[in-house]
């Protein structure tokens, strides 16, 4: 027998043995328990829009379905607003969303103003951390819920701490609770296709001289299990004269398993209204040279449409046909491979005095 014939025979025997063991595994553990990656029906990860076009681009499309997402940042940086927009996007597409309000601080009026259908939003205000995470697990296993938001990890108080007296030390109880919960729910999340967003707060490590002293609550388990981690910060307060009407938020993608990480997105959050979608649109239109900025003036197809950013946004909101056309042109350019840089995006109330550099826009070969 030649060497080539010997290799062919061995290959056939291996294929036969592989088919037998794959069949045995599927009989024991169910269909889909093992598969060839090329045969998987979920090769491309589907996404849920964040409500901010700039953040969607930074994430590679939005929040991934069937994954764990962590959003953390300082107080009043826009964490809850960000998740309420995600809930609104899910509901627009006919999906079901749940909000586990461990902080007992959800404002239904504000949620409704962001486009959330509060009548059909599932809300739970659990008494203990164990109760909250058990509810999350059951919602996931039902395969009937598309998005679950937990606000927040810091408020998931273990039962032992609640039943104890004030001042009792229950060291590591919350970290152990989160570690056990993540082990339990991660597999169910992948099977159901449900996205779970955990909001988290920041704490300062004691005695840190060098490096970043900030850390998130609930131990390290969530950091490992999360496919996406977003660090959201307030970088500017938006004012008209002395009146404050919003904030400029900056989001850094600290971790991303489904797209390139460490991208940065900026957008405006208006008090009582949420994320300024038109502001995001203007940012990207300016970056892709669809709308040109010369000094303080913005022009579209050679005609001035507004002096200053505020006036340009108002003009776009009043001319919906052109606004929709600009949005279509942006999506077309991005599909063709135009890459935008968030570093040149300005705040909502800024009146720039110089034109955008052509070098800020790079075309991917």
From Swiss-Prot:
Family annotation (SUPFAM superfamilies): P-loop containing nucleoside triphosphate hydrolases (SSF52540), RecA protein, C-terminal domain (SSF54752)
Protein name (Swiss-Prot/TrEMBL): Protein RecA
Upper taxonomic lineage: Bacteria, Bacillati, Cyanobacteriota, Cyanophyceae, Synechococcales
Pfam families in alphabetical order: RecA, RecA_C
Gene Ontology BP annotations: DNA recombination; DNA repair; SOS response
GO molecular function: ATP binding; ATP hydrolysis activity; ATP-dependent DNA damage sensor activity; damaged DNA binding; single-stranded DNA binding
Membership in a protein family: Belongs to the RecA family.
Residue spans crossing the bilayer: none
Annotated keywords: ATP-binding, Cytoplasm, DNA damage, DNA recombination, DNA repair, DNA-binding, Nucleotide-binding, SOS response
UniProt: ATP binding residues: 73-80
Job of this protein: Can catalyze the hydrolysis of ATP in the presence of single-stranded DNA, the ATP-dependent uptake of single-stranded DNA by duplex DNA, and the ATP-dependent hybridization of homologous single-stranded DNAs. It interacts with LexA causing its activation and leading to its autocatalytic cleavage.
InterPro entries, per the entry: AAA+_ATPase (IPR003593), DNA_recomb/repair_RecA (IPR013765), DNA_recomb/repair_RecA_CS (IPR020584), P-loop_NTPase (IPR027417), RecA-like_C (IPR049261), RecA-like_N (IPR049428), RecA_ATP-bd (IPR020588), RecA_C_sf (IPR023400)
Superkingdom of origin: Bacteria
HAMAP family tied to this protein: RecA
Gene: recA
Subcellular location, record wording: Cytoplasm
Keyword ATP-binding in annotation: yes
PROSITE patterns from the UniProt entry: RECA_1 (PS00321), RECA_2 (PS50162), RECA_3 (PS50163)
CC annotations in GO: cytosol
SMART domains listed in its UniProt record: AAA
């Amino acid at each position: 027998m030649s060497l080539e014939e010997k290799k062919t025979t061995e290959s056939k025997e291996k294929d036969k043995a592989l088919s037998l063991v794959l069949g045995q595994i599927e009989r024991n553990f169910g269909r889909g328990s093992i598969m060839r990656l090329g045969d998987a029906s979920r090769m491309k990860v589907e996404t849920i829009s964040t409500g901010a076009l700039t953040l969607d681009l930074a994430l590679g499309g939005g929040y991934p379905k069937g994954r764990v997402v962590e959003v953390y940042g300082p107080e009043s940086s826009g964490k809850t607003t960000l998740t309420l927009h995600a809930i609104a996007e899910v509901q627009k597409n006919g999906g079901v969303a749940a909000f586990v309000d461990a902080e007992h601080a959800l404002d239904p009026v504000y949620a409704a103003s962001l486009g959330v259908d509060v009548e059909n939003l599932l809300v739970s205000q659990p008494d203990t951390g164990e109760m909250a995470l058990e509810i999350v697990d059951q919602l996931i296993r039902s395969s009937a819920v598309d998005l679950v938001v937990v606000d927040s990890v810091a408020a998931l108080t273990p039962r032992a701490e609640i039943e104890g007296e004030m001042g009792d030390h229950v060291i590591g109880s919350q970290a152990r609770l989160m570690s056990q919960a993540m082990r339990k729910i991660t597999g169910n999340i992948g099977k159901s296709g449900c996205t779970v967003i955990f909001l988290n707060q920041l704490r300062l490590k004691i005695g840190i001289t060098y490096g970043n002293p900030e850390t998130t609550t609930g131990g390290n388990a969530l950091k490992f299990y999360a496919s996406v981690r977003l660090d959201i910060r307030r970088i500017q307060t938006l004012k008209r004269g002395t009146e404050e009407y919003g904030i400029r938020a900056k989001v850094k993608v600290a971790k991303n398993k489904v797209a390139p990480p460490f991208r940065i997105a900026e957008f405006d959050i208006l008090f009582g209204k949420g994320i300024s979608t038109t502001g995001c649109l203007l940012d990207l239109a300016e970056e892709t040279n669809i709308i040109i900025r010369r000094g303080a003036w913005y022009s579209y197809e050679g005609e001035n449409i507004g002096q200053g950013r505020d006036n340009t946004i108002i003009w776009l909101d009043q001319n919906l046909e052109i606004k929709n056309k600009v949005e279509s042109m942006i999506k077309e350019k991005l599909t063709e491979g135009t890459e935008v840089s968030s570093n040149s995006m300005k705040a909502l109330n800024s009146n720039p005095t110089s034109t955008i550099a052509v070098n800020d826009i790079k075309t991917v070969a």
